[in-house]
């Protein structure tokens, strides 16, 4: 005989899938469900937990349990979806410049004529060729930060760099402190490697470091993952005081710092990176996707010497080495000034797109940074982000909800709007459609 709670789960699942309970419907409270179904409160909680695991509902602390929009995949915004040609992509950031294709053609011609072309057919050192690591180290040198080429490891993009850091230095069950809203790609890594993410509350200016201090006093935290320069999705840039405080706290509690600098090169005059305040315990990860091109999968891990062998071993276990065809191309662009030129142009492009976003979304509670390629848009108290995302998809506009970025129990009703993928002339009309949809959702 089927367990009582299973029958309740099946009945609700059928009602949701058939549309009898439409997206956005608020379900009864746990106590009301328990009383109505004549089950215990613990069983009612189990019913909702199973429905949530099935991707049918989402529970939000303080608000209740709601039916998810089944036309959107769970975690909308995490998994790269195939976007139809007629869809305006405000979900992912693929910032590119018109002249980059011609520059790539010329770079490939130059590479083909280089004298060491045969070397690209052979295995290379796991961390990359030392000459290229030296070029990258000099490129990343800035105020208070001059990495040694020996500590630079070339990887297949910043995401691969994060994966190698996690794989090499952390173990299943380790507690990693992260912002309550954080980069969705790190959440995916944490799930794959069975890490426990502990959410640090977010303030407008950055993470609540007092809350991190309290967490470290109460639990054995192994590491902290941080995006101090152009945080994704909130766009903040931590000031020097916050960076020093984070470094001090990490020393006090012997934390590994994983500094994600994927967007850092887009900021004109950023503060010194966190690694400059705690070089002995910080792994610095960056790449060339956001400042150059997402398809050129070259990333960089800068590691303290004591951690380097473990990260290098992880590279060996996964990709052996980064293809030198691509790393050579990037290094040639660094040396001839192409990277610097593209970075300057990308900063200008991001600022122009932010200006358009500020103009179109004026009056809405937008959270962002002038150098960022995305904005965070909190919604009204009664608004439903999944319903709004679906309404926009019906208009052929793709956006991300807050769910992929959220680590805490309470999922905010908000949208992350990426500005970098659409042609500049298409951005304003797309954002006008977003504004119209948001206003309709608020006053429906």
Residue spans of the language-model regions?
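Conserved active-site segment immediately N-terminal to the catalytic lysine
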Residues: 270-289, 309-312, 415
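Conserved core of the PLP fold type I
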Residues: 119-253, 264-283, 440-442
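N-terminal basic, amphipathic alpha-helical segments
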Residues: 1-112, 116, 121, 312, ...
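Hydrophobic residues in well-ordered beta-strands that form the structural core
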Residues: 178, 199, 257-259, 330, ...
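Short beta-strand "wing" residues that participate in macromolecule-binding interfaces
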Residues: 58-60, 147, 399-400
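Short Gly/Ser/Thr- and Asp/Glu-enriched loop/turn motifs at secondary-structure junctions
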Residues: 62, 148-149, 368-374
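PLP-dependent aminotransferase class I/II
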Residues: 284-369
């Amino acid at each position: 005989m089927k367990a009582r709670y299973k029958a309740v789960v099946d009945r609700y699942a059928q009602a949701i899938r058939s549309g009898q309970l439409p997206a956005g419907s608020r379900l009864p409270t746990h106590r009301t469900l328990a009383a109505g179904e004549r089950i215990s409160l613990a069983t009612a909680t189990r019913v909702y937990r199973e429905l949530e695991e099935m991707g049918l509902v989402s529970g939000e602390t303080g608000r209740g349990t709601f039916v998810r929009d089944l036309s959107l995949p769970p975690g909308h915004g995490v998994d790269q979806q195939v976007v139809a040609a007629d869809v305006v992509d405000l979900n992912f950031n693929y910032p590119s410049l018109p002249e980059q294709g011609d520059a790539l053609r010329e770079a490939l011609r130059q590479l083909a004529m280089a004298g060491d072309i045969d070397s690209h057919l052979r295995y290379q050192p796991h961390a990359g060729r030392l000459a290229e690591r030296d070029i990258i180290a000099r490129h990343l040198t800035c105020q208070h930060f001059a990495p040694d080429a020996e500590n630079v490891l070339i990887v297949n993009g910043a995401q691969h760099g994060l994966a190698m850091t996690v794989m090499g230095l952390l173990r299943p069950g380790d507690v990693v402190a992260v912002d309550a809203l954080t980069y969705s790609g790190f959440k995916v890594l944490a799930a794959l490697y069975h890490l426990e993410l502990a959410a640090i509350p977010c303030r407008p200016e950055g993470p609540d470091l007092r809350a991190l201090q309290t967490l470290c006093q109460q639990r054995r935290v192994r590491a902290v993952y941080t995006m101090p320069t152009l945080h994704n999705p909130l766009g903040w840039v931590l000031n020097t005081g916050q960076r020093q405080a984070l470094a001090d706290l990490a020393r006090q509690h012997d934390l590994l710092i994983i500094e994600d600098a994927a967007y850092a090169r887009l900021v004109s005059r950023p503060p010194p990176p966190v690694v400059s305040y705690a070089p002995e315990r910080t792994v610095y990860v960056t790449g060339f996707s956001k400042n150059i091109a997402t398809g050129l999968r070259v990333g960089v891990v800068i590691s303290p010497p004591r951690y380097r062998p473990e990260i290098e071993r992880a590279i060996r276990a996964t990709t052996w080495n980064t293809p030198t065809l691509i790393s050579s191309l990037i290094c040639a662009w660094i040396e001839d000034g192409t990277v610097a030129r593209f970075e300057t142009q990308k900063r200008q492009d991001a600022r122009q797109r932010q200006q358009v976003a500020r103009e179109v979304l004026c009056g809405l509670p937008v959270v962002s940074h002038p150098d960022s390629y995305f904005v965070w848009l909190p919604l009204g108290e009664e608004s439903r982000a999944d319903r709004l995302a679906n309404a926009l998809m019906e208009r052929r506009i793709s956006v991300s909800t807050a769910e992929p970025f959220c680590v805490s129990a309470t999922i905010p009703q908000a949208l992350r709007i990426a500005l970098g993928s659409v042609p500049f002339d298409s951005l304003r009309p797309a954002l006008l459609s977003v504004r119209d949809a948001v206003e309709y959702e608020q006053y429906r």
